[in-house]
Amino acid sequence: MPLLDIEGHLHSAQLIDEEGRKRFLKGKLGESFFTTQELSNAQVIGIAEGVATALSVTQVEGFPVVAAMSCTRFRTIVPLIKKHYPQAQIIVLGDCGHGEAEAKSVALLNNVPFVSPSFSEEQIALFKKLTRTTNSPTDFNDYYVVKGILYE
């Protein structure tokens, strides 16, 4: 996945192997991010932690989503996108668990909405069955899988 700055210059890329392991090419992440669609005329822009969530939300909801590439990068990416796209409503799309507090904090700090999925015990069990793992669901990609909108 290419990681571009606000002007479209390539800074790095995230590689994901067949086992789902992620790594970045050498380069400076700085203010770079991945985006699912052009942002310049967007009325709504989501900002997610990772690429899977960004792609899933765009596919289902139809608006562009930026992947910050980690929860700690929300502090850089949210104000950057808000500043450069003042016409758009910015929505922070948090994951459940580890990065949720960071995402909420950044959304509050930047006066933008925060949303994250929630899962019932039944949905957690269904997710584990559908994905044949012991992992619990954590993000909107997982939410759409559980809801039967996307398939793992």
Residue ranges and their predicted role:
Residues 1-85:
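Phosphate-handling DNA/RNA-contact segment within nucleic-acid enzymes
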Residues 43, 55-152:
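TOPRIM fold recognition
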